[in-house]
């Protein structure tokens, strides 16, 4: 995960000061890419401890098509609480767009089911794409998608994934995003009888909030440790039937947690 640390250094050295929606302010760079070979291990940042439970339950929540934080809260995950309304609703965010994209004709599209089926049927397709940036529904969302699209690519029996992210909270958010898309790639690869290949992140406005700068500098003093391995303990009949206990992270030995405030 040294490439992640190099991105932190890049922002600290080259970032432009910008004001932002949250009022916190950022150091920002534009247009950055990271690549991870999933054969080398599961890409969990080791220079600080990540809350794996939140990463797994959030992805399962997305895949359920759920947009209310109740499921997350029942499972000890609070990462979406700041944006939810008094009933726990977030509007048509990721889960709604992934599982029930509303078209102009009023019909809905299950993009996840469609892309899994297409990978199985036509792995050479260049249309293995899921999009969460539904312009017609952005104003109904409590937070428009930061990671707004992802594409799969099959070659030599391996499934690779590239995701696009318009806005990147590099200290708090990006380590979660990396792990989440790695997990999704492993799950879909298993469902499609494939091995995993490469995970690629492409970011637009890639930034450090000003109240994360000292934490990032602390993280840069730490030496990365070996990556853990992901074990999928069973193969469910569907991508939608995975449960929390189906996943095991083996050999995760991170440095201690570094606390930082969330910019809302």
From Swiss-Prot:
Keyword Methyltransferase carried by entry: yes
Superkingdom of the organism of origin: Bacteria
Enzyme class: transferase
Enzymatic reactions: dUMP + (6R)-5,10-methylene-5,6,7,8-tetrahydrofolate = 7,8-dihydrofolate + dTMP
EC annotation from Swiss-Prot or TrEMBL: 2.1.1.45
NCBIfam families per the UniProt record, alphabetical: PRK01827.1-3, PRK01827.1-5, thym_sym
Xref: PANTHER family: THYMIDYLATE SYNTHASE, THYMIDYLATE SYNTHASE 1
Protein name, per record: Thymidylate synthase
Species this chain originates from: Geobacillus thermodenitrificans (strain NG80-2)
């Amino acid at each position: 995960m040294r490439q992640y640390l190099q991105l932190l250094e890049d922002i600290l050295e080259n970032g432009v000061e910008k004001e932002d929606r949250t009022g916190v302010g950022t150091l920002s760079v534009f247009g950055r890419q990271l690549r991870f070979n999933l054969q080398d291990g599961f890409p969990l940042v080791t220079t600080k401890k990540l809350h794996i439970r939140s990463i797994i339950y959030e992805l399962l929540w997305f895949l359920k098509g759920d947009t209310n934080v109740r499921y997350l809260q029942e499972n000890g995950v609070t990462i979406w609480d700041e944006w939810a309304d008094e009933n726990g609703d977030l509007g048509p965010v990721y889960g709604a767009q992934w599982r029930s994209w509303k078209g102009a004709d009023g019909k809905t599209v299950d993009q996840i089911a469609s892309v899994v089926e297409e990978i199985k049927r036509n792995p050479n397709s260049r249309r293995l794409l899921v999009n969460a940036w539904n312009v017609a529904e952005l104003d109904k969302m409590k937070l428009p998608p930061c990671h707004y699209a992802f594409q799969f690519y099959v070659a030599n029996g391996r499934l690779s994934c590239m995701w696009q992210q318009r806005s990147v909270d590099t200290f708090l958010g990006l380590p979660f995003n990396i792990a989440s898309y790695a997990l999704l790639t492993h799950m879909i690869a298993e469902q499609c009888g494939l091995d995993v290949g490469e995970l690629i992140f492409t970011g637009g406005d890639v930034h450090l909030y000003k109240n994360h700068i000292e934490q990032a500098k602390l993280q840069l003093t730490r030496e990365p440790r070996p990556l853990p391995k992901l074990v999928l303990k069973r193969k469910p009949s569907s991508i939608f039937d995975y449960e929390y206990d189906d996943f095991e992270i083996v050999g995760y030995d991170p440095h201690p947690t570094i606390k930082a405030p969330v910019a809302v």
